[in-house]
Regions:
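Short aromatic-glycine-(Arg/Gly/Cys) micro-motifs in beta-strand/loop hairpins
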Residues: 1-17
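A broad, structure-centric signal for solvent-exposed, well-ordered loop/edge residues
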Residues: 8, 15, 30, 62, ...
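Secondary-structure boundary/capping motif
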Residues: 1-3, 36, 62
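A short, structured loop/turn motif at beta-sheet edges
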Residues: 23-30, 57-61
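A short, charged, amphipathic alpha-helix used as a generic interaction element across diverse proteins
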Residues: 25-45
Length: 77
């Protein structure tokens, strides 16, 4: 399984999650990240104001970015 890390980005600031996550594919990592963000936004709508989550591969290079508007219902955009 491939290794992925998550980076919460707010403008130029970046906070790296110290955990390493294992998924079969990058799409599986993105799907899990979208699900997690959707769950957190349902609990607290302002949880990701101005922030995004970067998914990085084992080398630390970002391979995908998930923004709140990617997972919000259309009526909240």
């Amino acid at each position: 399984m491939a290794q992925f890390t998550l980076i919460i980005r707010s403008g130029p600031e970046a906070t790296r999650d110290p955990n390493v996550y294992h998924f079969p594919t990058a799409q599986d990592a993105r799907d899990a990240t979208e699900h997690m963000m959707r769950t957190l936004l349902a609990e607290r709508a302002d949880a990701f104001d101005g922030k995004a989550i970067e998914i990085a591969d084992a080398t630390g290079h970002p391979i995908a970015v998930v923004h709140p508007y990617d997972v919000m219902p259309v009526r909240l955009h």
